[in-house]
Regions:
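Structural preference for solvent-exposed beta-strand-turn elements
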Residues: 1-203
Length: 203
């Protein structure tokens, strides 16, 4: 079975780069990759490390289809070379251990083919009921995160959960890796309740 869809190449490349920021090396292959799902004229790219989920949505045309990239980093490099309409041809043949999933990406005179994984193997994001919400200017939020992010360090399994995070509390945004503390104060940007997240997820 072959399904076909098309998206804007630059929009797809940008979305892929953005969600890929949350990816980590994992013993579970799909957690190191990006899920692509096209349905109802919309292409949704999803990436997760289980703790953090990133989604990007862009317009799409064609058949409904879904798959998980293999070697997302290599796919992202290829996508940066595309410009214009990007055609996605997804092939799903065979069954069981003989099942073969391939993705052909065509744009202008260029074409690349990658192996893919089944979308049903990707974890499902459980519904989240927000305890609080607030609206901020994205550029202002990014600036604050960049000011303190140097003290967040790189998240690693051997570290405490807070070491790779930026934390929000009221007018304060801060980061602490055990040896360094960075804090920024801005009364015009208030978090209604304390929370923390990976700095890389916000950059």
């Amino acid at each position: 079975m072959i399904r076909k869809a098309s998206v804007d190449a630059k929009a797809f490349s940008t979305a892929l780069d953005q969600v890929s920021k949350v990816l980590r090396k994992s013993s579970i292959p799909v957690l190191s990759e990006v899920l692509v799902a096209i349905s109802g004229g919309q292409c949704t790219l999803t990436a997760t490390d289980i703790e953090t989920w990133l989604f990007q949505k862009i317009p799409a045309r064609g058949d409904d289809l879904s798959f998980v990239f293999r070697k997302t980093k290599d796919v992202a490099k290829a996508c940066r070379l595309f410009d214009g309409e990007l055609e996605l041809e997804f092939s799903d043949t065979g069954e069981g251990k003989y099942r073969s999933l391939t993705l052909c990406m065509l744009c202008g005179g260029r074409a690349v083919e990658f192996e893919a994984m089944a979308a049903e193997d990707y974890p499902v994001c459980a519904p989240i009921k927000a305890k609080a919400s607030f609206t901020v200017n994205a550029a202002a939020l990014l600036k604050r995160v960049e000011l303190v992010g140097y003290a967040a360090g790189k998240p690693a399994s051997t570290e405490r959960a807070t070491c790779g995070n930026v934390q929000f509390s009221g007018k304060y945004v801060f980061a602490l890796d055990g040896t360094r503390l960075a804090c920024d104060t801005d009364e015009s940007l208030m978090a209604p309740r304390p929370f923390m997240t990976y700095a890389e997820s916000l950059s």
